[in-house]
Amino acid sequence: VFCTDVSDASGMLLFDVKNRCWSKEMCEICGITEDMLAGIYESYEKVGCVKEDLAKELGLTDHVAVAAGAGDNAAAAVGTGTVGDGRCNISLGTSGTIFISSEKFGVDKHNALHSFAHADGHYHLMGCMLSAASCNKWWNEEILGTKDYAAEQADIKNLGENRVFYLPYLMGERSPHNDPDARAMFIGMSMDTTRADMTQAVLEGVAFGLRDSLEVARSLGIQIARTKICGGGAKSPLWRKIIANVMNLKVDVIESEEGPALGGAMLAAVGCGEYPDVETIAEKLVKVVDTVEPEPELVAKYEERYQKFRTLYPTVKGLF
């Protein structure tokens, strides 16, 4: 079966996201006919069964259903229960995303956020920064020469009081700047700056970068009070605390650490008829095991820091 799902197809300019189909207008402009393109399915729809010869090789029956599935971030959102209206998930992987589900289609006219079809049958807004947990890996492994991230973070004491800023643009930046030439930098060091200050600045810089996308969503009238979190970086209790207070959001930690894989399995379960829809299976399977609450005093400190952070990129942009 030659097919794709709506969440992955949303990344192509040939796709009409609002109507969840190939755009006739864009196809005509590009000289493409729709029969050249993959069939479009909802992420939870059954598209066929495993081929007989492959099923035999794998020791399966020839009636194993195959669902369309979803792109990585959409699948992660399903796996963290970020479905329905007004739910949020932050992913701290190599790159970082803030993913907000919505029952209505909306567009940021400044193109700071992506507007895509979601795997749950609705839509989502997404901000994506190109370097998130990869900033922490680069700092620890390439610069400090260690893989003991926890030991480096153990020396961080005074949250919200660090005088060092870090711009997390190691590979340019997507949301919200859309600038391939943006570059990372540390700003504000002095003779008093410590190794822990620099490590803290990296964690905070990524959190500030994600908040840039959250602020765009807020400017569109979207109000979020809490978020799920996933990805390798989310295993750090300190980073979770920083994000909760930089964003002023409750941060929910879920039981499963395999958001995208779990999301794919959940979509398959809906496709096989085990559950009626994605929202139902998310309510059944996704379990919150911890919640990080923002602390008013720390939120106030980080608010002041963030307002300074957001002036840095426009100021240094001409240097890149």
Model-assigned labels for residue ranges:
Residues 35-40:
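Active-site-proximal helix-loop elements at catalytic-domain edges
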